[in-house]
Regions:
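Charged docking surfaces used in two-component/phosphorelay signaling
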Residues: 15-23
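Active-site residues of response regulator receiver
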Residues: 52, 82
Length: 122
């Protein structure tokens, strides 16, 4: 079973994604802030990370950069979630090494699953 780490401070969104991922046959790990997410990425060795950008304790960009600079986590695919379309955040996330992104206000559940399946190595 593939393991997905979801770093997101909104617990309602954590639950929604958890339900979806479970139905799709994935195991979901949760972190409610950037610092915890970074620690869990290193200790839990997830197959993929869903990363919100606006997080308490450590911003998503800091987490993303730290993950990509660490030999133990640099190859983990990362899907960034943001509300901040049109602010340059998507471009910055991709430059820092994100695999792809989702705009929170406009994604569909099918899109989430499709992006996860595409980003996950077989």
């Amino acid at each position: 079973m593939k393991k997905i780490l979801f770093v997101e401070d909104e617990s309602a969104l954590q639950k929604t994604f958890g339900d979806i991922l479970k139905q799709e046959g994935y195991e979901m790990l949760s972190a409610l802030d950037g610092e915890t997410g970074l620690t869990m990425a290193k200790t839990e060795n997830p197959d993929l990370i869903l990363l919100d950008l606006v997080l308490p304790k450590k911003h998503g960009f800091e987490v993303l950069q730290a993950l990509k600079e660490d030999a133990s986590t640099k190859d983990i695919p990362i899907i960034v979630l943001t509300n901040l379309e049109g602010t340059g955040d998507v471009e910055k996330a991709l430059e820092l090494g994100a695999t792809t992104y989702l705009i929170k206000a406009s994604y569909t559940l099918e899109e989430v699953v499709a992006k996860i399946k595409k980003a996950l190595p077989d």
